[in-house]
A protein has these predicted regions:
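Bacterial N-terminal signal peptides
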Residues: 8-16
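Sec/Tat signal peptide C-region and signal peptidase I cleavage site
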Residues: 16-22
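Amphipathic, charged alpha-helical segments and their helix-to-coil junctions
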Residues: 23-176
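Bacterial N-terminal signal peptides that target proteins for export
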Residues: 1-8
Length: 176
């Protein structure tokens, strides 16, 4: 009985150890894929257009402020103190409006970037997942941001590069 127990334990240990060694690990360079995706290019163009609209609005406030400031400086010597105070108050309000709009525009731009880019990154991650599952990979490392993810070192040569497979899955062609 003891021999049977030892034999069973030995077989179980060998089965466990062989399954550990049979695991496949891959790597992918998403930085080489995502910028070439048509979805990324479209999202980037939309984000750039949105940023330009916000910048145009900000510049319009700046132009309005500059015009009112020039008018104030031109007439400052000829207007009453009460009108001066009114114009100064108006200028301060415009400055505050500029600062407020600038802050809101930065937040809006960040939100818009998340809104536009999140689906692109999700699409890329889904393609990696599909390739990993089809290829039997336990883990696929993104070499583009390995250090940022807390991985101090890994031997890239020991990992199977699945970048080309992910590109094919996403119909990505490298930019020329």
């Amino acid at each position: 009985m003891k021999k049977f127990l030892k034999l069973t334990l030995a077989v179980a240990l060998m089965a466990c150890s062989s399954s550990v060694f049979a695991q496949k690990f891959g790597r992918v360079d998403l930085a080489a894929i995502i910028p070439n995706m048509s979805e990324y290019k479209e999202a980037s163009a939309n984000l750039e257009s949105y940023a330009k609209d916000l910048q145009d609005q900000l510049e319009a406030i700046q132009v309005e402020f500059n015009n009112k400031l020039a008018e104030y400086e031109k007439t400052a010597g000829t207007i009453s103190d009460s009108v001066k105070q009114l114009k100064e108050s108006e200028l301060q309000q415009l400055q505050q409006r500029y600062r407020d709009f600038s802050t809101i525009a930065q937040q809006d731009l960040s939100n818009k970037e998340n809104e536009l880019m999140t689906p692109v990154f999700e699409l890329a991650n889904e393609a990696v997942k599909k390739i990993a599952q089809a290829g039997g990979y336990l883990i696929v490392f993104n070499t583009a941001n390995a250090a940022a993810s807390g991985i101090a070192y890994f031997d890239e040569a020991a990992l199977t590069d699945v970048t080309a497979e992910v590109k094919r899955e996403l119909n990505v062609v490298d930019a020329q």
